[in-house]
């Protein structure tokens, strides 16, 4: 077991010395109970982001390596559930049985290894499906000013996947918890939560959790 000490901590970032063999993306366990993820490797110290407040972390406190890469539990049990950026349930429906553990950052497959995009993903919006069709497997940016209907397009697309064998993952970053709760109720009312996972990193969550939220959603999708 390799043990280090905190040099500085603040603004959800900590600098630690004594962890010579720490790896990029590894989870560190602080004596206060807070966990962090290594993001900066230097000859004499490492820098990490904290998945919790830095107020309880003092200079000189103990830090332990876990040997685990930052990841998220995955499994079919996540369908219909609302989780945070670490895969922990936040919908009050109890624990989620996991069937594996995937790193939140994994190498992207090469072009040869990727499956071709050969089937459409219908959004249910005639203007998009007829003029700008989206293929299953492609990435699509929806950009626009506030209150212009970006979320409505994404929500309509999720609702239109019912009965098509598509699993939808909605990652909410920096939104109000009340807005996400309203969205989940809408999905439940339309029967869409049966094939949907919601990852929520609200405005009240730490910047570190908001940062890893899209990676967590991608890991769930890769499963």
Cite the ranges covered by each PLM segment.
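Conserved nucleotide-binding/hydrolysis micro-motifs of P-loop NTPases
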Residues: 21, 53-56, 69-70, 87-89, ...
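Glycine-rich, histidine-containing beta strand-loop boundary motifs that form or position
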Residues: 50, 94, 144-146, 172-173
């Amino acid at each position: 077991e390799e043990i280090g000490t905190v040099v500085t901590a603040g603004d959800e970032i900590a600098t630690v010395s004594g962890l010579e063999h720490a790896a990029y993306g590894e989870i560190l366990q602080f004596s206060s109970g807070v966990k962090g993820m290594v993001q900066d490797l230097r000859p004499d110290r490492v820098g990490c982001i904290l998945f919790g407040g830095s107020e309880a972390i003092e200079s000189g406190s103990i830090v332990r390596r876990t040997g685990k890469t930052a990841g998220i539990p995955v499994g079919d049990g996540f369908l219909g559930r609302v989780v945070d950026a670490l895969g922990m349930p936040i919908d009050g429906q109890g624990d989620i049985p996991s069937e594996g553990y995937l790193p939140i950052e994994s190498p992207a497959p090469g072009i040869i290894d990727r499956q071709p995009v050969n089937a459409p993903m219908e959004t249910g919006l005639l203007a998009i499906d007829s003029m700008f069709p989206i293929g299953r497997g492609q990435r699509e940016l929806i950009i626009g000013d506030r209150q212009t209907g970006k979320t409505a397009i994404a929500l309509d697309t999720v609702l239109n996947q019912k009965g098509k064998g598509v699993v939808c993952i909605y990652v909410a970053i920096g939104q109000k918890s009340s807005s996400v709760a309203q969205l989940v109720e809408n999905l439940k009312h339309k029967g869409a939560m049966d094939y949907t996972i919601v990852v929520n990193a609200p405005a009240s969550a730490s910047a570190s959790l908001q940062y890893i939220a899209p990676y967590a959603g991608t890991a769930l999708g890769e499963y």
